[in-house]
């Protein structure tokens, strides 16, 4: 009986120490809390933008009197547009206006391009921080013919299509490269009583820089 009583007293005395050791083990076995990970905000192409471009055009003017003339030269202008974004699909509308210095003569007939502009739809795919895109729409340009005796200038309307790559340089600054093909169709010019039929196609490569609002 005395031995049993002694065991009970010893067990009661050791119980607090056992509970403390068990609690310490339980605390030590808890996994560490992971540090919070900062997620960079996703860039959005949505919204308005404007910018400037510089390019070079390789043109081909077919005429009914002297055949083909190739008035190649530099061009420059401005563009502006508005984007919408649905997941990774970016779409919107863009317009541009500029001036082409393309001019060349053949056998006394000169073809000269001046003002040019377009209004186009644009659709791209977000590959943050770049966006490849396709574009197409209507185009217009002032085109002048001169045969030395007379000249006539007409505003021509046609279509344009192309592709490009836009890149986010900063949160607001955009850079781009773009290829465009434009066709202005056929038009008759009356030069000193001679009817000259002209068709003009242009291919140009442009680089641009823009600001996103």
From Swiss-Prot:
Cystine crosslinks: none
Signal peptide limits: 1-23
Stored InterPro entries: Enterovir_OMP, OMP-like, OMP/PagP_b-brl, OMP_b-brl
Entry keyword set: Cell outer membrane, Membrane, Signal, Transmembrane, Transmembrane beta strand
Gene that produces this protein: omp25
Protein name listed in UniProt: 25 kDa outer-membrane immunogenic protein
Family recorded in the similarity comment: Belongs to the Omp25/RopB family.
SUPFAM superfamilies the record matches: OMPA-like
CC terms in the record's Gene Ontology section: cell outer membrane; host outer membrane
Main location: membrane
UniProt subcellular location: Cell outer membrane
Pfam families recorded: OMP_b-brl
